[in-house]
A protein has these predicted regions:
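Outer-membrane beta-barrel pore domains
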Residues: 3-179
Length: 179
């Protein structure tokens, strides 16, 4: 478990010391929880992250938040953001003696995540496209412990008026230490 609390105003953004902004603190509270289980040929991982920003409606109006070349008037800053996910995989090669003896692994896995980068205050507009659900299934093949070949099919599920986003991903990763 990890957490953080602090004031986000006046870190790098100057403000009018006598104006309305002088009363703002932009209290930021973050919390994070994660776990990993790796035993008996199963691997499971999960996480939960949440952040809350005080004075979110007023932070949007502070001067100096955008460059002069920005095409946007003022972007909204939500009061909160959330991300959570769960992944479970099973080592299929654990049931095949020769592959198990060679220390090869083939994990079939499923993954689910939910995230929303903009949770508005009651006075702010809602942007439903910021809320996303994602599911994935795939295989992770370890021919040797330091190399993994990955294949994944995933789909992001958006609100009805938007298109879902399917994808296929292939990759190779190497785990090593640099001296």
């Amino acid at each position: 478990f990890r957490s953080y609390y602090g004031h986000s105003i006046d870190n790098t953004l100057g403000r009018d010391a006598n104006g309305k902004a002088s009363k703002l603190k932009g209290a930021l509270c973050l919390g994070s929880l994660d776990f990993t289980y790796n035993a008996h040929n199963w691997i499971a991982r999960g996480h939960f992250d949440y952040g809350h920003l005080g004075d979110a409606e007023e932070v949007r109006l502070l001067p100096g938040r955008q460059t002069k070349t920005s095409p946007f008037n003022r972007d909204y800053v939500g009061k909160a953001a959330i991300a959570c996910g769960l992944e479970v995989g099973y080592n299929i090669f654990s049931q095949i003696e020769k592959l198990r003896a060679d220390n090869q692994k083939l994990y079939a896995f499923a993954h689910y995540e939910y995230y929303n980068s903009y949770i508005p205050t009651a006075m702010q507009p809602k942007f439903p496209y910021t809320e996303k659900h994602r599911m994935a299934v795939g295989l992770n093949y370890y021919p040797v412990p330091q190399i993994v070949i990955k294949a994944e099919y995933s789909q992001r599920f958006l609100k009805r008026q938007y298109n879902n986003e399917p994808s296929v991903s292939l990759g190779v990763a190497y785990e090593g230490f640099f001296l």
